[in-house]
Design a protein with these regions (language model features):
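C-terminal motif of bacterial Sec signal peptides marking the signal peptidase cleavage site
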Residues: 22-25
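Terminal, low-structured helical/coil segments at or just beyond the last alpha-helical repeat
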Residues: 31-45, 221-275
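Structural marker of alpha-solenoid helical repeat scaffolds
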Residues: 49, 83, 117-118, 151-153, ...
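Alpha-helical segment of the N-proximal tetratricopeptide repeat
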Residues: 49-83
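Helix-start (N-cap) detector for alpha-helical repeat units in TPR-like alpha-solenoids
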Residues: 54, 88-89, 122-123, 155-158, ...
Length: 275
């Protein structure tokens, strides 16, 4: 279930892996250590020519991907793999590209290859988990999110926790969804998707007061135009359950303004609050 409007069909974890790919250095044989035991700082001069080529190609691939120029992005990844046939991030990037191109079989092949090359890479686990969840394979996806979250070296675990919660919501496992989402909230309180997902969890559990708490937070941490019709309709239904006609009308105005032709707005016009 999608809660935030996106420019393309990107999963919530895509931005993370793009950042990881763009910033990842290509490791050499290892920096020298002195008596202190501390490693020398790795700089650009420590990279081999092949490693620099891979990094440049991957940065170009990310740029094309963000512009939705998937064929050009794919070409850059292929060139990166010519320089380093075992570059895990390149296979992960190619998985994302194929996913956006609708080539789901090729996407999975590359995600699996990336995971085999770097089984401890949390970003790759997160993105493969997101792929599986979008395919409805929740039972396979959740262990991958768990693996990412268990990695203490993972610098940005909040989106993975949110993705896991969103995935659990798909199978109406509200207890697991709540657990994952509260973890995400603790890590990054202002992540809009997490607040929207928690509002959904508590609405489904008929705890409308707590649902409204996260709807109110969402109003503070997200731009109104970024919210999907689904989220705005959820906000309307929460206010309807609480009997707050003023707030209900306010959210309805936003739904009409930003998504006038949506099925959610049509449902609001019918008064179909319990569908």
């Amino acid at each position: 279930m999608t809660f935030l409007a996106q420019r393309s069909r990107l999963s919530p974890a895509t931005i993370l892996v793009l950042a990881a790919v763009a910033l990842a250095g290509c490791a050499s044989s290892g920096p020298e250590r002195g008596k202190s035991g501390q490693a020398e700082l790795v700089t650009e001069s420590d990279q081999t020519s092949a490693q620099r080529k891979v990094e440049i190609r991957m940065q170009l691939a990310v740029g094309y991907f963000e512009q939705r120029q998937y064929t050009f992005a794919l070409d850059q990844v292929k060139l990166a793999l010519v320089a380093d046939p075992n570059h895990a991030d390149a296979y992960g990037m190619r998985g994302l590209i194929y996913q956006q191109m609708g080539e789901q079989g090729l996407a999975e092949d590359n995600f699996v290859r990336a995971r085999k090359l770097a089984p401890d890479n949390a970003d790759l686990a997160n993105n493969y988990g997101s792929f599986l969840c979008q395919a409805g394979r929740v039972a396979e996806a959740l262990p991958l999110f768990d693996a990412a979250l268990a990695n203490r070296a993972y610098r940005s675990p909040a989106p993975a926790a949110n993705n896991a919660g969103s995935c659990a919501l798909k199978i109406k496992d509200y207890a697991s969804a709540e657990r994952y989402l509260l973890q995400a909230l603790q890590l990054t309180p202002d992540l809009p998707a997490t607040n929207a997902n928690l509002a959904r969890v508590y609405f489904e559990k008929r705890d409308y007061v707590r649902a409204n708490f996260f709807i109110t937070r969402l109003n503070k941490v997200a731009k109104m135009e970024s919210l999907t019709a689904d989220v705005l309709w959820l906000a309307i239904k929460v206010q309807h359950k609480l009997g707050d006609t003023g707030a209900e009308s306010g959210w309805a105005t936003q739904l009409r303004r930003h998504h006038p032709g949506s099925t959610e707005y049509a449902a609001y016009q019918r008064g179909a609050f319990d569908e």
